[in-house]
Amino acid sequence: MVGTMPLCGRRAILEDSKADGTEAQPLVPTGCLMVLLHWPGPEGGEPWVTFSQTSLTAEEVCIHIAHKVGITPPCLNLFALYNAQAKVWLPPNHILDTSQDMNLYFRMRFYFRNWHGMNPQEPAVYRCGFPGAETSSDRAEQGVQLLDSASFEYLFEQGKHEFMNDVVSLRDLSSEEEIHHFKNESLGMAFLHLCHLALSRGVPLEEMAREISFKNCIPHSFRQHIRQHNVLTRLRLHRVFRRFLRAFRPGHLSQQVVMVKYLATLERLAPRFGSERIPVCHLEVLAQPERDPCYIQNSGQTAGDPGPELPSGPPTHEVLVTGTGGIQWHPLQTQESERGNSRGNPHGSRSGKKPKAPKAGEHLTESPQEPPWTYFCDFQDISHVVLKERRVHIHLQDNKCLLLCLCSQAEALSFVALVDGYFRLTADSSHYLCHEVAPPRLVTSIQNGIHGPLMDPFVQAKLWPEDGLYLIQWSTSHLHRLILTVAHRNPAFSNGPRGLRLRKFPITQQPGAFVLDGWGRSFASLGDLRLALQGCSLRAGDDCFPLHHCCLPRPREISNLVIMRGSRAHTRPLNLSQLSFHRVHQDEITQLSHLGQGTRTNVYEGLLRVGGPDEGKVDNGCPPEPGGTSGQQLRVVLKVLDPSHHDIALAFYETASLMSQVSHMHLAFLHGVCVRGSENIIVTEFVEHGPLDVWLRRQRGQVPMTWKMVVAQQLASALSYLEDKNLVHGNVCGRNILLARLGLEEGTNPFIKLSDPGVGQGALSREERVERIPWTAPECLSGGTSSLGTATDMWGFGATLLEICFDGEAPLQGRGPSEKERFYTKKHQLPEPSSPELATLTRQCLTYEPAQRPSFRTILRDLTRLQPQNLVGTSAVNSDSPASDPTVFHKRYLKKIRDLGEGHFGKVSLYCYDPTNDGTGEMVAVKALKEGCGPQLRSGWQREIEILRTLYHEHIVKYKGCCEDQGEKSVQLVMEYVPLGSLRDYLPRHCVGLAQLLLFAQQICEGMAYLHAQHYIHRDLAARNVLLDNDRLVKIGDFGLAKAVPEGHEYYRVREDGDSPVFWYAPECLKECKFYYASDVWSFGVTLYELLTYCDSNQSPHMKFTELIGHTQGQMTVLRLTELLERGERLPRPDRCPCEIYHLMKNCWETEASFRPTFQNLVPILQTAQEKYQGQVPSVFSVC
């Protein structure tokens, strides 16, 4: 692997370092491992450490060095070992053979730009703040500083070395302006370097400059450039630098300020700093509906079958990994690929230009010849990673997969360790993505229920719920110390976790034993120690601490070990307190044959009429609807709630609301709810081959285990998606798994969909819950929604996995209710499969303690380990054939479901994209031009597609691809399906508080700030074009009027005529057809007005302005509206709108464009306002 961080060496020999990182090395004793350091620690000493133990892991070496240098446990995971000779980073579990001479380098590998907060244009980076501080708008209160003092010092020394060894090189610059800028910045960096030395040694700056030449503090390429000048030029440069030093008085600067300025300038000067670029021999983005990247080739594949030949040859693509930008990739140019991407040079290519750091979705190039970067994912989107030899699969929660083939197995391990490290730092500190790079200490911690080095407020939050809780954690200050923490509740502080007084008892690690200080007994494992402590009490002085229950680490816990990068609204769980689903009219459905009974429901096959009158064909060969009504007919399943159970209709609707707000290819699609007289009907998709348990029983003894494991993987994928959203299915079992594709033919895989749970657990009687044993989790027998959690679904998954293994026969099915209940009471174990690996997996899922059950990410990771032929099947195609483009959609596979809405020139509809025509498609939103559009509109349509394909932001609707029809010469835009529709349609029908409206407004500003940063103006920002993904997340859509602002210009002048949303336009747009960035701010003000009026049609901008100007048409409307706005008339204050919010609207409606705030300015203002009104009832709002 080629890391962009150059190699490190001794500070004493920096002046002789080469640009490629190869420098003179200290003499290595024979049979010894030497690790070189950038900084030896506060005590000084030699900048290297030697090891002579027989066998060590890379993690053990890092821990030893961190202890020597003074790096604290929370920062340990930022560091790793680099092998200069092999040019790879070592994964933490790599076993080092110290019998051979070896030089390694201890470096900070995991880096997050703007961790110092000096650049307001980039996301703030900080560790998660203390519980209860999230509502603060002050970053200092919001989060914890990323680095400790030793890590900061080490990074500074590492950054100095990288700068002087040409992480950004003068040789890569071409224009005089770039060279001049580089020289000035380099001299400034040299000044900061000398300032730091002077402050640390306590000597005057001029004296330090006489002792150390500034040329020793600038890049190697700059030094060589200076040597080429004549003596007079060099002397003049020395004098200029010394005059600058004499004129400057650094008394107000501290060492810390100097170090921060140095690193912040280095980030700006060298965009590659802190990133890694990895050349790969082969890259594919796999969309699972087209090519299922599972790990069996066909149903007859055996574990011993060899995999396909791995691609070889020069690199074809390059992958970019950064802490703030996630994973991106681009193809390599031919000449670069032929050179192997300069693999012998640890820097790769360099650039002295100053582009922004790559962020999610940005297509950034460092040179005009370099292809743009394509965004793949952020680390928290990853579900699991599979590594086999040189091939890596990165699987996402939405089932997309990145397939990479690296140049060597060592590079593959290095790359996976990089992705895994960033995942643990940003998503889940107690989970690893891949066994092959699992940190040994983390594996031990998971096995023994040990928390990471949590700070006290997070410990207090975990111990607060009840008395008798305790936890075991790694110390926050000592790398080799474990601590048992208990809490004493202080009656004087009873309102929160801060009222707990913590007491810590160290646990000493001895060879093969653990000893709790103050207790003479030793234990072979922490599990044995926990078992012995159960029910005991610890006494310290006059205090007595009962130990009833040990708090174990949980998936995705928020703590100081998780690093936040700006606002992450999409991590908030869905709020299901308000029902939301599509209503199906009773005339649109036809009830057909009865399929059976569910819990309090009757299930029928049916037909759902969708589409317009020109689509009168019938899907899947079904007969047309009686009466001859036109439109396409879809086969559906009708789940009819028995009218006698009208008392649980709300629970029935809650199920429909849950399934309507989620979208995953392995979840059955819910079309909506129909009320037919006294009947309540859920209308869901029809899946061809029906329930899995019935099919398995029919095929008893004929289905191979590999087939079953693919099904298990797909089920775990769907449940992992729900777990990430903190949603509980509550009824995972074989009868609710529907088989869409059999996958028995060679080259195919099965495809399943998890159906809706039916009537929710909370509405079931105890008898019904007992009847569902063994799928019902033990904690759910008592009833109530408080017992429902994601661990409930894990128990159901374990029981279903047994059901799949046993050909559809579930355990305990022959027993009566009392026997089943007694089975749970006695905590008996369900029967296990004969495979030891499968037995271990099901045992973990079916533990009676919910906190001890693993996460679905863990299950997905471990399921891949059960299949030795990991890569077989994903590459069972001609290696010479080009990879299919996942952004190309074919019209024949698009099945229309219903219309979603219309814009000025286009129409948006919901489609199912089903290329295999077997019910495995995904729901997408497709936008097409209306008929009769002229060439001018078609040209604008192409521009909209080109704009949207370059954007990637959490508050902008995602581009999926295009569908071209060569016959009709038309292009359809395919986007993600946003289930809840536009704010214009949503707000009038739902009760939304002011704080939530302000959150929407803040998110709109964040999306628009990103759009403006990409040099686009929207020109059609309105509530109708803001889509609601869930009740905490909005996305901007409809870029039909968007324009790119030419470089160096402040506005775009529109010359074409067309239908325009004039009531949302600023005066300069109406009068001069000039569209500034500030023109979008005006439109935002009108959009904010719409939000505060709840999109009431009687108070719409169109209605209000029409009342003021009278009914007019065409240009007369524009003329009168312009005159009205120039007189200072504005939309009135909405009812119950706070004064400061209406004042903010009026700021957005300033006549002079330059007086309006920017979206960047609006974000913190709205965030502060949102926090102010969070939790307040309407009566306390400060209205005018």
UniProtKB/Swiss-Prot annotation:
It is an enzyme of class 2 (transferase). Its EC number is 2.7.10.2. It catalyses: L-tyrosyl-[protein] + ATP = O-phospho-L-tyrosyl-[protein] + ADP + H(+). Keywords: ATP-binding, Kinase, Nucleotide-binding, Phosphoprotein, Repeat, SH2 domain, Transferase, Tyrosine-protein kinase. The protein kinase 1 domain (also termed pseudokinase domain) mediates autoinhibition of the TYK2 kinase domain. One of its GO terms (cellular component) is interleukin-12 receptor complex. InterPro entries: Band_41_domain, FERM_2, FERM_domain, FERM_F1, FERM_F2, JAK, JAK1-3/TYK2_PHL_dom, Kinase-like_dom_sf. The modification Phosphotyrosine is found at Y295, Y604, Y1051, Y1052. The active site is at D1020 (proton acceptor). Residues 449-529 form the SH2 domain. Residues 33-430 form the FERM domain. GO terms for molecular function: ATP binding; growth hormone receptor binding; non-membrane spanning protein tyrosine kinase activity. Disruption phenotype: Deficient mice are viable and fertile but display multiple immunological defects, most prominently high sensitivity to infections and defective tumor surveillance. Absence of TYK2 results in increased resistance against allergic, autoimmune and inflammatory disease. Residues 589-866, 894-1166 form the Protein kinase domain. ATP binds at L900, G901, E902, G903, H904, F905, G906, K907, V908, K927. Coiled coil: none annotated. It comes from the Eukaryota. Belongs to the protein kinase superfamily. Tyr protein kinase family. JAK subfamily. Tyrosine kinase of the non-receptor type involved in numerous cytokines and interferons signaling, which regulates cell growth, development, cell migration, innate and adaptive immunity. Plays both structural and catalytic roles in numerous interleukins and interferons (IFN-alpha/beta) signaling. Associates with heterodimeric cytokine receptor complexes and activates STAT family members including STAT1, STAT3, STAT4 or STAT6. PANTHER family: NON-RECEPTOR TYROSINE-PROTEIN KINASE TYK2 (PTHR45807:SF6), TYROSINE-PROTEIN KINASE HOPSCOTCH (PTHR45807). This is Non-receptor tyrosine-protein kinase TYK2. It comes from Mus musculus (Mouse). The gene is Tyk2.
